[in-house]
Amino acid sequence: MENIQKLIARYPLVEDLVALKETTWFNPGATSLAQGLPYVGLTEQDVNAAHDRLARFAPYLAKAFPQTAAAGGMIESDVVAIPAMQKRLEKEYGQTINGEMLLKKDSHLAISGSIKARGGIYEVLTHAEKLALEAGLLTTDDDYSVLLSPEFKQFFSQYSIAVGSTGNLGLSIGIMSACIGFKVTVHMSADARAWKKAKLRSHGVTVVEYEDDYGVAVEQGRKAAQSDPNCFFIDDENSRTLFLGYAVAGQRLKAQFAQQGRVVDASHPLFVYLPCGVGGGPGGVAFGLKLAFGDNVHCFFAEPTHSPCMLLGVYTGLHDAISVQDIGIDNLTAADGLAVGRASGFVGRAMERLLDGLYTLDDQTMYDMLGWLAQEEGIRLEPSALAGMAGPQRICASVAYQQRHGFSQTQLGNATHLVWATGGGMVPEDEMEQYLAKGR
């Protein structure tokens, strides 16, 4: 307890985190892209290479997953305006939201119905390509739909994949790995929803369940993989490959905005609100957005009050050297995808200069907004996916933040607020009804 008091003396906001208060922290260390980029350790070339790799796999994906065929084997989600929800939020919170609110529906991505369809699937494909190229079975000029042949399935069946997950990452990696022919084991934390485990098992995936939280599931997955040279462990806490799979979203969004005639520049700022668990998904997406829109995009991470691992790590500068449990927080939240007690040290250090801020919200707030979105827009998400929905009113309410960045009322009036909906498209009907019943 004495250590917590010392921490609070240096970092006063920790007191609010410990008290489980909804907290907003605007990052005083936020810099320009030019200043912040070198610290990421990855470049635009790396993201372009990821983009190209996904293009090589497009013919394969189009055949393996017919739901991607219309998009030519591209796994991408819609961006939709949510004007009725914007009005509802203004009414509920008594706060005008300047500009226009949009929803990025990663909740409805093909294959696994969450943002993890970006990073998880990309890393599995990257590993499969590497093995096939090294074995001389494939060249990068080939039509990758040959990977669907029995010979390739046979080849990949010698190899296995392991991952630790609270649910959605396991879903994307499990489904993709099983499709390619890998043996796959998903180490699931106590937070993982039963339907996600059942879905994985229906794809022939081995699911190992733990009574502990996410950190333990990842650690056990890592250990299990170490003993088997043919087993590849996908490391959600440190993976650069996952990060790049998410980062591709930046250029894709830029293209979607161009199609819609939506301008993002100094006079028309873009604010993006990303739910954050361990940090790989939001970190990678934010990195891609920064490369695509430069200093005209402002990224915020959103976390449950019971799992504020990234806010705690970045705010104190301790990153993965501190967990929410260290300050007496239980890491128990209805936002199962965000139930992470210790943030990725890689993501925190890579992105701490490129984030405008982080905030927390209560589980009940997520349930309330889940209900409002279903009522107003007919869009149903899982609780985690609503974390970003609390962002616009926090930004619009903070005169200090607006002044620090020199935003005029005109600029704010021209702003786009993009809420990144991270999951929920595959939630079973009865489960969704339970979520809806919890909203006020």
Curated annotation (Swiss-Prot):
Enzyme class of the recorded protein, top EC level: lyase
Named cofactor requirement(s): pyridoxal 5'-phosphate
Biological source species: Salmonella typhimurium (strain LT2 / SGSC1412 / ATCC 700720)
Catalyses which reaction(s): D-serine = pyruvate + NH4(+)
Binding partners and assembly: Monomer.
Name this protein carries in UniProt: D-serine dehydratase
Keywords: Lyase, Pyridoxal phosphate
InterPro entries given in the database record: D_Ser_am_lyase, Ser/Thr_Dehydratase, Ser/Thr_deHydtase_PyrdxlP-BS, TrpB-like_PALP, TrpB-like_PALP_sf
Gene: dsdA
Family statement: Belongs to the serine/threonine dehydratase family. DsdA subfamily.
Catalytic activity, EC: 4.3.1.18
Positions of modified residues (N6-(pyridoxal phosphate)lysine): 116
PANTHER family associated with the record: D-SERINE DEHYDRATASE, THREONINE DEHYDRATASE, MITOCHONDRIAL-RELATED
Keyword Lyase applies: yes
GO molecular function: D-serine ammonia-lyase activity; hydro-lyase activity; pyridoxal phosphate binding
Lineage, uppermost ranks: Bacteria, Pseudomonadati, Pseudomonadota, Gammaproteobacteria, Enterobacterales
Pfam families per record: PALP
GO biological process, one term: D-serine catabolic process
Signal peptide: none
